[in-house]
Amino acid sequence: MKRLKLLSFVVLALLATSSASNANTDLLTADDLVGVSFWVISMGLLAATAFFFFERRSVSSNWRITLTVSGIITGIAFINYLYLRNVYVSQGEATTLYRYIDWIITMPLQMIQFYLILAAVRKVPKSLFWKLLIGTVVMVLAAYLGASENIPTIIGLTISIGAWVYILYEIFSGEAGIAAAKSGNKPMVSAYVSMRTIVIAGWAIYPLGYVFAYITNSADDNLLNIVYNMADFINKIAFGLIIWTAAMQNTTTRNR
């Protein structure tokens, strides 16, 4: 019963947000691939958010916070994508700058997940939490400042990539990488490696998009929106599902 109440609350809250967001917008045409991609990811994010919150009580207590954060990530992205969709339908475009509203919150939360899954199976220093958080905030903030021309675009890109390289070092060879290798928890290590792959491969799309949009000015806005939409769909939802899989495997092993 508690699960059903929680699921109902999450779905109703998100649908209420959706209704308010769509109150005064034009209709989406069926042949508009960009607009359709906004709807596809919005519905996927809504479903993922409900799923992660619903599944919290299916896993052991030390893993619940990871699913809570996964639900928060997809929930924030869902709300922002409704806004992006409305901007696109009403104005015919949705610039990348609007996406930073989402990224400045969700990407640091995704990096914090590395700390949380490690903390679920072993003791890790709190300093790791702050390293991952600050590194990711700098990465996104520098890119935003460059994209909005508050600082030179090339400087914004350089700082952002530098911060990205720093957090990659942390999760591959730094404190986080060492802690994962020593954990001895196979489901967690498997999830950690998969999440790490998303951060290096999936996140590479964002600086590439920055280069085409703000450095060379050669990006097709519609294509860029579709690529970003699909990247966010995979990066955010897959990230959470990977964590859920590890949480379920650890819970099953613990209950044997």
Regions found by a protein language model. Give the residues of each.
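Polytopic alpha-helical membrane-helix bundles and their juxtamembrane interface segments
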Residues: 19-99, 112-256
